[in-house]
Amino acid sequence: MALQNIGASNRNDAFYRYKMPKMVTKTEGKGNGIKTNIINNVEIAKALARPPSYTTKYFGCELGAQSKFDEKTGTSLVNGAHNTSKLAGLLENFIKKFVQCYGCGNPETEIIITKTQMVNLKCAACGFISEVDMRDKLTNFILKNPPEQKKVSKDKKAMRKAEKERLKEGELADEEQRKLKAKKKALSNGKDSKTSKNHSSDEDISPKHDENALEVDEDEDDDDGVEWQTDTSREAAEKRMMEQLSAKTAEMVMLSAMEVEEKKAPKSKSNGNVVKTENPPPQEKNLVQDMKEYLKKGSPISALKSFISSLSEPPQDIMDALFNALFDGVGKGFAKEVTKKKNYLAAAATMQEDGSQMHLLNSIGTFCGKNGNEEALKEVALVLKALYDQDIIEEEVVLDWYEKGLTGADKSSPVWKNVKPFVEWLQSAESESEEED
């Protein structure tokens, strides 16, 4: 069967990966009973990820004719004689209105019916939600015959929960194995000690001999001390003087070292604060510059972790520097830039088990709020949605970050107002999943 690109705008793209079969029609009947049969309508609808009844109904609405789709046989009929080119043109209009994303033009979309009975298209490629014109006649048919929803978000949450449970079980199993190994070592050490006591009588005797020897040595040392005190010869006196001098010189060296450390300490601190915090802007600029130079080298993303771990600055400062280096000067189109460079953020967000995602969210808030980037501030919700869809940030961390921000020192920041729709969406999705469970 011949294939063609989905969408008239992609007709001449030889490398376009979204394809559908070319339409094949057949005219049946005569007179008033003449009908047009769209033979491969089921295959076309399958390629578009839409029910075949939608395309059949759309042809009938646009042509002002009765249409019928038989679910059992897969037959699509439209009353009247219509040529293939005319129906193919109507199909292109259907694709443009009900299949392609209004943002990126990608046909990989899903029909979503909102609580307010509005038909939207959710793009799996860019995440854009397109609002379909509800004045179209087909929208009423879609509301009455909604498509089967793919529970992608629920599956993701279930997989995440299962993954967390699996990790916890693995940690518990590791702890149990460690305990078993420790018990085995203790038992083996006990057995070795028993066997050594039973089979080596010489070893039982030798400790007593050593103890006696030590006692003799101590007595000899005591005797030596008495001899030194009673020995008044010139050689003994000189020896004692040398020992005293060596002890005094050692004390003097220790005192001088302590004085040097005390002198150095005030230089590193001032009023309880490290000098590093007294003049942060130049150091932050240097850190951002280092990040930019590293990114210009074109090093693989896998090497980013080792580079970050080699830095001595606090984790939050490192994340701020990386974010500024990646998106310096970006305003409009901030969400698209984040999607392009998501791999860098994913690598940075997995540096630590706890805290890296929070550092990333703080960097986003600083970049959009404190820096006064109004264009980026408008797209902050889209940025969080993109990172959430890519599993770079988790729902619990976002909610925790939002709650702390509303009650923290930066509660007046405009970031929280722009983030609120995304947070409400997360909370509503969570409540719906709990109700269904």
From Swiss-Prot:
Domain W2: 278-436
Post-translational modification: Phosphorylated at Ser-201, Thr-230, Ser-428, Ser-431, and Ser-433 by CK2.
Binding site for GTP: 29-36
One MF annotation (Gene Ontology) recorded for this entry: translation initiation factor activity
Keywords from the named record: GTP-binding, Initiation factor, Nucleotide-binding, Phosphoprotein, Protein biosynthesis
Region (Disordered): 148-231, 262-284
Family assignment from sequence similarity: Belongs to the eIF-2-beta/eIF-5 family.
The name this protein goes by in its record: Probable eukaryotic translation initiation factor 5-2
